[in-house]
């Protein structure tokens, strides 16, 4: 037994609705896996490059894409944001998503320094 408990009000209900940030190689690997998992649905892809986002959405049968990360984190139809963007963007984007009330899965490294990591832990 630990002295920590799970805040059940923050536990997402299924299906988990995923937003993918980054239309590169790692996202091309993770999206098919998410699409195979019961209780998970990939809702939207984000890329800073609209053509890449549109192409990714078409390739993986996603209905929506965006080049606006602010829009993505404000989307009430998204529960989880998966960050597979250049690593220098991870901390800021994770912070933005956490502040918007989203669950976040971030590729390594989570941040470029320990202070940013501690900040993200505190927000989560």
Feature roles, as predicted:
Residues 1-60:
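N-terminal Rossmann-like dinucleotide-binding module
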């Amino acid at each position: 037994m630990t002295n920590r408990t799970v805040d059940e009000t923050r536990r997402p209900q299924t299906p988990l609705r995923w937003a993918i940030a980054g239309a590169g190689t790692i996202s091309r690997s993770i999206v098919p896996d998410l699409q195979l998992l019961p209780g998970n649905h990939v809702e939207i892809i984000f890329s800073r490059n609209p053509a890449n986002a549109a192409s990714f959405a078409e390739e993986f049968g996603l209905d929506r894409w965006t080049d606006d990360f602010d829009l993505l984190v404000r989307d009430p139809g998204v529960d989880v944001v998966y960050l597979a963007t250049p690593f220098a963007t991870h901390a800021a984007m994770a912070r933005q998503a956490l502040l918007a009330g989203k669950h976040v899965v971030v590729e390594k490294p989570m941040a470029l320094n320990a202070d940013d990591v501690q900040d993200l832990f505190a927000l989560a």
